[in-house]
């Protein structure tokens, strides 16, 4: 899921933190790519014309393998050295989110079956994409493929994005590659997005610089993590009523999430007390009565007064009913917000979520060795062609490209040799009567020059 609304905030408040590149400009870079996110992307995007996933003759899914093989070759052809990082065991705090995702997939399956009966082809395609689940077999097959290709793989102890960030921070790679913005929350100094997108999309690579983002938002790393949690992350139920703008405003106003939570809980308690007081006042309101009791001997005036009293009661009851309906409607509309405000869920362990971001379970970068090797051509043919039904000609051509580019001596980047120095200001011009103005000559200079030239001719 990543961090909701973070990209929009950076575009608005820290535009200098985001740059766009053509993939060709990234030659010479090493990148740690979130493989688990890539598998999910390929299972959704790499499909047949009818919208179904690619399969071999045995009915086995091959979309993920097709995606990894050809997208990795494209990356390598452009002079980039990828290393893929796979998810390990998810944090305990994430289990609730994973459970909800499972429920949504089951709902999508049921809706997909119904769409097959009465829906359009677009409906069927949409629901089938929502049912995608990355399995253990998908992971194992992708790891096997990448090793045969000579591309390094790392199995993270927990979150792949956190391990990518660690490798970038430790200098093993230049950047982390993922679509999840929480890679920045894990303190990745540089994040590449859209690196594994299809070339047909013509989507430029987006580079996000964490230091520039913090500077633009005017906050430190701890506050940035607080902001990301408040925006909505993978570990906590989002707070209804808090959008990107209000989240940024709250963190800036109160300085941190601890103070924000205390403030919101106090406001929620005050609103609750106020609502209870209003309910008590309404319950104590006396039924409307006539102000004047008319005597019985006023020639039928008593009957007229009774009718007026009944009308007043009727109007009062109608007004009370309308007020109750408006109150119920308002409560329904602001459900979870506490009478039009923001209300934090009772169980909202943000401190635990913050610790996951600040101290993630990762392998230290200095304990990881990334090595790019020659591809095992015959191994690739056996796995992709014999077992998975790929075209042998295409597999061998792809292997040739891997051999050529993975083993080629990488051309150094100019930004690795040169340091950009600030432009020096020109020396100050002499001041006073004796100073000659730039682009002008003193009287007599033209004459002297002219006579000098004439003398030379002689």
Curated annotation (Swiss-Prot):
Looking up Pfam families in the UniProt record yields: XPG_I (PF00867), XPG_N (PF00752)
- Gene Ontology MF terms: 5'-3' exonuclease activity; 5'-flap endonuclease activity; DNA binding; magnesium ion binding
Name the residues that bind Mg(2+) 1: 34, 87, 159, 161
Ranges where the record places region N-domain: 1-105
The organism sits in which domain of life? Eukaryota
**Region entry Interaction with PCNA, spans:** 410-418
**GO CC terms, sorted:** mitochondrion; nucleolus; nucleoplasm
User: CDD domains, alphabetically?
Assistant: PIN_FEN1
Region ranges (Disordered): 268-347, 416-458
One GO term under biological process is: DNA replication, removal of RNA primer
Ranges annotated as biased composition (Acidic residues):
275-285, 293-309
Q: Which UniProt keywords apply?
A: DNA damage, DNA repair, DNA replication, Endonuclease, Exonuclease, Hydrolase, Magnesium, Metal-binding, Mitochondrion, Nuclease, Nucleus, Phosphoprotein
**What kind of modification does the protein receive after translation?**
Phosphorylated. Phosphorylation upon DNA damage induces relocalization to the nuclear plasma.
Q: Where in the cell is it found?
A: Nucleus, Nucleolus; Nucleus, Nucleoplasm; Mitochondrion
Looking up SUPFAM superfamilies in the UniProt record yields: 5' to 3' exonuclease, C-terminal subdomain, PIN domain-like
Question: Could you tell me which HAMAP family the record lists for this protein?
Answer: Fen (MF_00614)
Q: Which family does it belong to?
A: Belongs to the XPG/RAD2 endonuclease family. FEN1 subfamily.
Describe its assembly.
Interacts with PCNA. Three molecules of FEN1 bind to one PCNA trimer with each molecule binding to one PCNA monomer. PCNA stimulates the nuclease activity without altering cleavage specificity.
**Descriptive protein name:** Flap endonuclease 1
Q: Which organism is it from?
A: Coprinopsis cinerea (strain Okayama-7 / 130 / ATCC MYA-4618 / FGSC 9003) (Inky cap fungus)
